Structures are given as C-alpha cells and as structure tokens.
C-alpha cells in the first residue's frame, strides 16, 4: 500500500474547500507572515502597509506591545524591551551568559536551569516572548484572511538543534497556532525561487540578516533538499554595518558622549537611513546632532568591506566542510535585508562566479517559501500539482555487526527526506560489504522487517576500520527509498531502490509500533549484550593479529598473562551477562597496554630505518 496519508483530526480537507494556511519567518531582527492568494505567494501587511514586524516585545505592568511601537520604547525602557529573543531559544542560562554577556536584561534561572527574563510583566522565558511575537503575526493573518489559519509553517535556521526546534513549536502552541511543519530557512528560500522543481544540483543560500549571517549549502536531488553543510557568524549582520556607519558619523560630528541613549539612537537612526539610501544612490546628505555632511557609497563600502570579507571566509569554510568549491554551486540565493547593499551582491557574485538570485525581496523570500509549503500541506494544491508530503510510518535502517539495527531515518519523519551516516569495515583487508536494509522500531534484526540487500564490492585493502563507507538513505515524495553506499577514498559505490511500506497494512504497522513499546526494556538489554559481544570479537581478532605479528616483543610470562585474559574474555562471550563481558574487555585492555606501546615503538623504528635525521 502507499504510505499513510496523515492529517490531524478535523483537518481533513473537504473537496473544493480552500483552507487558510500561512508561512511565518520568525526572524532574529524582523518577522513576517505570508500566504498564497490566487496561486501567488504574498506577504501580509499591517494597517500601515508594512510587511516587516520587528521581533521586539515591550512589557508593561498592564500588558505588552509587539513590533514597531515596542522597538521605539527600547530607547526609554531598555530592560523591559526584549529583542533578538531567537538567539536565546533552547539555551540554558549559563550558555546565554557565556555567549551574550552584554545583554541589558536581568536574568533568573528557573527550576530546570532555563533562563527567565525579569520584566514589569513578570519573569518570562524565551518561549513566551516568541509566543507574543507569533500571536501578533497570527492576529495580522486572521485580519487579512478573515479567519483563523488552519495551519502554519514556521521557518528555523538549518543549524537549530532539537531543543531550539521544540522551543519554536512550544511558542507556536502558546500562540494558538497549529504547526504543520518546521521548515529550514535555506530550504524555504530555495522553494520561493521554485528551485525544488528545477534542475538538480548544489545551491548556496547566503543569508545576511540584521543580527546574524548564515551560509547553507544544499543539494537538490529528486525534489529532496539535503543540507550538506551550514556555517556563518552569529555575531555579524546588518546591525554591524549600522554600528560602523554610526561610529563614522560620530567621528565626523565630533560627538563622544556615550551615556546619552537618545543621542545614540539618533546616530544609529541616521546610519540606517543612510545605508538604505546608498543602496540606490551614490551619495546622501546627512544631518544629525548638529552636524551636516555627505557620505558616499564608496565611503560606506570602505567601512563595511572587512565585514563582507568575513562572510565570504565563512562561505569558503562551509564549502570546504561540504567537500565542494564555489565552482560546484549552480545557484546562489540571497536572503536578508542586508543583501540589498550593492557591495554585498557584487562580492558574493565574484566569489561564486555567478549572478546571485535577487528578484524576490530578500526580506520576504523565506516567508514566501514557507507560505508555498503551507499551502501544499493543508491540501490546497490540485491533485495534478500537489507534491505528496507524508511521513515515514516506520523507522528505516540497516544491519550492523551482531545483528543490530542502526536506524538512519526515524519514523514520523516528513518526506521527502535524505539522511546519511558513515560506517567502516570490521575485518582487516575486507574487500566487500553486504548492506541489509530494515524497517521497524526494534533493536535487533530478527525483530524488524527485511526490505532488501545489496553488496558494495571493490573496497580498498585496509586494516579494520580503515575504509569509510557513507550510506545515504533518500525517500522521495512518493515514498520510494533509494539507498546508496560509497567508499570515500575510491568513490566505489552501489545503490538500490525499494518501496518501504509495500505490502504492509495499517494494522501491521500499528502492531510493529506497539511491539517496540512493549519490548523496549528487553530490546535495550539485548542490544547491549550484542554490542558487547561484537566489541569482544573485534578485540580478540585484533589481539590475535598482533600476537602473530609481534609476539617476539613479549616475554613468555607476559604472553601467558595476555593469553589468559583473552581466553577469559572468550569464555565470557559465550554467556549472556553484558557487565561481565565489558569487565573482561577492560581486563584485556589493561593487560595489553604495554604490548601496544612496544608495537608502536617498533613500528616507528621500522618506518625511520635507513633515513637520516634531516629527512624526517
């Protein structure tokens, strides 16, 4: 049968009934909400026609305000005005104090060590502050659409961990939103440009926002985006451009008073306006704090050039992490308002050797991609156009030594999806590997469903653990699983395709999940025992090879002690006590440490034989 089509109770779309769906870009500096109308994705504005909502909340004894009004209050009531709360999401108080020591807020630790921000409205955690921002966006959407959205897609940075993602979901729940999916920001940007339905290849997402810089390298294959590498600088953004320009204006005006917050605000405001104007003009007149003068684009470029260079160094490092060069990138997508700066576009184009995509407003592109995805997920696309986005009903994995199952893609993962993991060889000189694909939630191969087997041959003759095989699982939108195994040093690869859920009924899937829950404790015990037996076999095989090669390095007494320890380990292996096996492994390790050191010394002497000191 096909993969289960899952929808929340009460959310199964009736024929011809259009559902309200929105995409939200919950940003560090600004946030946006967008929807699809008449087949076109568009951002929703406030009553003053503004798309952007500053991600700022001002708290009072009698309530709070969000957005532009809250941002204006920052000058007068800094301690009760929370901004850039996205940086705090999912972090402990100790982590925040280490990373951001100069924040103006007063923090308290909750019982579980999470941060609480002290405000006039009480102590609030980052999830609650984020919920207030999301509530403001939800109210804007409800007003514009004439009803409560049936579902929302919220974007998050690709590097967000589970705690940060869960915090975002919790904030949405507090705001009364039904989250269809969290979507990686770079993927949303690529979707906005329609790259998900275009040619396959490598895409770079250059995201220079107000407070942070992120670079993401994606590979698009069969409609699936795989994040190859991410990088960036959490302390570099357009705000730093503004700061440099404001400092330059201070120097020109001869103003050095750092205690006047209103004066600070005036210079910063003048810097922001000048930066925006210089995106389309060659020069701009400035009047601030009694100083009048002109700043040119050339002067601005000179100020910010070192910061732009820092972003490109991050790009180079991230490409290196992905094993790629700038020439391997087919498309470059610009995200974030700071990418409007002409120098940024020029330098990025030069670095990648191609013109970046900038036709969609860089402030809006992530929200637009999220809106397109939300429109699909609530079922508004006609069948002929709709990409089936479903979940994997049972975990997918492969067999490892000892009859164990290594899960690669957990159940309930949204498809399409791609995940990869590295494995290595178990024996010296191993020239091939049989890859056994499995489906299920249990820890042992015998308790899971076998999907397929395929072989990878032609591995280089190396010691155990020397060859590195990258196994990639990819499930497309139709539920078709493709698995590729590649040895990294030689490029030797093999692959197979299989329909994971073919032949399974809903009842069988439910039974497999229930069995995994009922047998969880026994399964964990069985896995631990199997893992210790595999490790024992590895230790004994390695020791046997060492004794054959270098027994001459040991006295008879020393060899006798090692052999006795190995025989004891072999005996323990036949039993069913993982603790006893682990203890026997430690004994062998202790008894062979001096032997290992002598073997290392002998190996070094052999390697240096016949060479002078100058050659080493």
Swiss-Prot record:
It comes from the Bacteria. One of its GO terms (biological process) is iron-sulfur cluster assembly. CDD domains: ASKHA_NBD_HSP70_HscA (cd10236). InterPro entries: ATPase_NBD, Heat_shock_70_CS, HscA_NBD, HSP70_C_sf, HSP70_peptide-bd_sf, Hsp_70_fam, ISC_FeS_clus_asmbl_HscA. Keywords: ATP-binding, Chaperone, Nucleotide-binding. One of its GO terms (molecular function) is unfolded protein binding. Disulfide bonds: none annotated. NCBIfam families: HscA (TIGR01991), PRK05183.1 (NF003520). Chaperone involved in the maturation of iron-sulfur cluster-containing proteins. Has a low intrinsic ATPase activity which is markedly stimulated by HscB. Involved in the maturation of IscU. HAMAP family: HscA. Belongs to the heat shock protein 70 family. This is Chaperone protein HscA. It comes from Pectobacterium atrosepticum (strain SCRI 1043 / ATCC BAA-672).
């Amino acid at each position: 049968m096909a993969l289960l089509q899952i929808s929340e109770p009460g959310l199964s779309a009736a024929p011809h009934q259009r559902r309200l769906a929105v995409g939200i870009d919950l940003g560090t500096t600004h946030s946006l909400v967008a929807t699809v109308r008449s087949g076109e994705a568009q951002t929703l504005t406030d009553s003053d026609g503004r798309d952007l909502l500053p991600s700022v909340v001002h708290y009072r004894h009698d309530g709070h305000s969000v957005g532009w009004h809250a941002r204006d209050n920052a000058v007068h009531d800094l301690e009760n005005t929370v901004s850039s709360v996205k940086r705090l999401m999912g972090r402990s108080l100790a982590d925040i104090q280490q990373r951001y020591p100069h924040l103006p807020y007063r923090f308290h630790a909750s019982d579980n060590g999470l941060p609480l921000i002290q405000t006039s409205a009480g102590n609030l955690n980052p999830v609650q502050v984020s919920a207030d921002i999301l509530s403001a966006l939800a109210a804007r959407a409800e007003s514009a659409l004439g009803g409560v959205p049936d579902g929302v897609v919220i974007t998050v940075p690709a590097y967000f961990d589970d705690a940060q993602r869960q915090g975002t979901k919790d904030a949405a729940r507090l705001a009364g939103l039904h989250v269809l999916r969290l979507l990686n920001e770079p993927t949303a940007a690529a979707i906005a440009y329609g790259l998900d339905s275009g040619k396959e290849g490598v895409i770079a997402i250059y995201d220079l926002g107000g407070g942070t810089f992120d670079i993401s390298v994606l590979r698009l294959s069969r409609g699936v985006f795989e994040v190859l590498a991410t990088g960036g600088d959490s302390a570099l953004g357009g705000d730093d451009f503004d700061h440099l320009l404001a400092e330059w204006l201070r120097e020109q005006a001869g103003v050095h008073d750092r205690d006047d917050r209103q004066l600070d605000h005036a210079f910063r405001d003048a810097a922001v306006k000048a930066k925006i104007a210089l995106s389309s003009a060659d020069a701009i007149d400035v009047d601030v704090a009694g100083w009048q003068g002109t700043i040119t684009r050339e002067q601005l470029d000179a100020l910010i050039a070192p910061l732009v260079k820092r972003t490109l160094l991050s790009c180079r490092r991230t490409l290196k992490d992905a094993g790629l060069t700038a020439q391997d990138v087919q498309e470059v997508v610009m995200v974030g308002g700071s990418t409007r700066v002409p120098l940024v576009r020029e330098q990025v184009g030069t670095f990648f050797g191609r013109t970046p995509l900038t036709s969609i407003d860089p402030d809006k592109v992530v929200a637009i991609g999220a809106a397109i995805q939300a429109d699909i997920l609530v079922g508004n696309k006609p069948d002929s156009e709709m990409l089936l986005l479903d979940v994997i009903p049972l975990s997918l994995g492969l067999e490892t030594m000892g009859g164990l199952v290594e899960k690669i893609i957990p159940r309930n993962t949204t498809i399409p999806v791609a995940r990869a993991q590295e494995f290595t060889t178990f024996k010296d000189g191993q020239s091939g590997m049989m890859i056994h694909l499995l489906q299920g939630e249990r820890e042992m191969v015998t308790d899971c469903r076998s999907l397929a087997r395929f072989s990878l041959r032609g591995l280089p003759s190396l010691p155990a653990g020397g060859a590195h095989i990258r196994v990639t699982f990819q499930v497309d939108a139709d539920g078709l699983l493709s698995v590729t195994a590649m040895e990294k040093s030689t490029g030797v690869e093999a692959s197979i395709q299989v329909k994971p859920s073919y032949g399974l009924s809903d009842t069988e899937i439910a039974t497999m999940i229930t069995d995994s829950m009922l047998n969880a404790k026994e399964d964990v015990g069985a896995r631990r025992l199997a893992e210790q037996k595999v490790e024992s076999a590895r230790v004994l095989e390695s020791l046997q090879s060492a004794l054959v090669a270098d027994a001459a390095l040991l006295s008879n007494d020393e060899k006798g002690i090692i052999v006795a320890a190995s025989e004891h380990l072999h005996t323990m292996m036949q039993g069913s006590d993982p603790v006893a096996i682990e203890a026997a492994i430690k004994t062998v390790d202790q008894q062979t440490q001096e032997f290992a050191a002598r073997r290392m010394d002998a190996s070094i002497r052999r390697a240096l034989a016949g060479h002078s000191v100058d050659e080493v």
